[in-house]
Design a protein with these regions (language model features):
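Canonical Rossmann dinucleotide-binding motif of NAD(H)/NADP(H)-dependent dehydrogenases/reductases
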Residues: 2-36
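Catalytic loop of short-chain dehydrogenase/reductase
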Residues: 12-21, 93-179, 191-193
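Helix N-cap at the beta1-alpha1 junction of Rossmann-like dinucleotide-binding domains, i.e.
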Residues: 40-43
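A glycine/serine/threonine-rich, flexible loop-to-helix segment
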Residues: 48-49, 158, 179, 189-215
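Rossmann-fold cofactor-recognition segment
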Residues: 51-69
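A glycine-rich helix->loop->beta "capping" turn
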Residues: 53-59, 76-91, 96-97, 101-104, ...
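Conserved Rossmann-fold cofactor-binding substructure of NAD(P)-dependent oxidoreductases
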Residues: 66-80
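Hydrophobic structural elements of the Rossmann-like NAD(P)H-binding subdomain
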Residues: 89, 142, 184-187, 197
Length: 217
């Protein structure tokens, strides 16, 4: 993979074990110029520590995906530093921890439902809308989804609905941006021990079941 001189925005680096961190490392090794975002000051040091372990000088910038103004500020920063953008990696998802265990119907709340969809799905198209004018032709937008969007996964609950929304989002975004040769895709990764996965009750059992059933040992 040759990404030399490609400008890539990676959202969702929360720890060294996050999927976004692995993507950033692979992109760095392939020659891309990277910008990693962090949600708040608490995560800033983690992101900068990960950046310092890479080969290139990596940019970092704060962005709370629930804030339109912060997404706008991120775009302005990219315009100042790079002018244009080639790749957006959206690896962000969130739901209140108390909704990721137990009975779905009994535990669901209006606020939690809205928040899960806002951060996990709407933020992807919000980024595309804000950055549309600075995306190069043939740009790529990529997000991360999971089997829980298609099948009932114990304790995944509202995140399953949010991921289903995200996948439909991908299809409509692809149609909308396709005229400019901008590709929009989603990768459905298997269960991985990440910081986000730690919030799902019984995740280790899910991981064990997948390991038992997987044809690859």
């Amino acid at each position: 993979m040759n990404l030399k001189n490609k400008k890539a925005l990676i959202i969702g680096v929360a720890s060294k074990r996050s999927i976004a961190a692995a993507i950033a490392s692979a992109f760095d090794a392939s020659g891309a110029d990277l910008l990693l975002t962090y949600q708040n000051e608490k995560l800033k040091n983690r992101v900068e520590e990960i950046s310092n372990e890479m080969n290139s000088n990596i940019l970092s910038y704060p962005c709370d995906l629930s804030s339109d103004s912060e997404i706008s500020n991120l775009k302005k920063f990219i315009e100042e530093k790079w002018g244009k953008l080639d790749i957006i990696i959206h690896s962000a998802a969130f739901a209140p921890r108390e909704l990721l265990s137990g009975d779905y119907v009994n535990n669901i709340t209006r606020e939690g439902f809205s928040l899960a969809h806002d951060i996990s799905s709407y933020s992807f198209v919000a980024l595309a809308k804000e950055f549309s004018k600075i995306l190069n032709e043939n740009a790529t937008l990529l997000t991360l989804t999971y089997l829980g969007s298609q099948k009932v996964i114990k304790n995944y609950n509202v995140m399953g609905l949010a991921k289903a929304s995200l996948e439909t989002n991908v299809r409509y975004m692809a149609q909308s941006l396709g005229e400019r040769n901008i590709r929009v895709n989603g990768i459905s990764a298997g269960p991985i021990k990440t910081l986000a996965a730690a919030g799902i009750s019984g995740f280790n059992e899910i991981l064990k079941r997948v390991e038992e059933k997987s044809p690859l040992k």
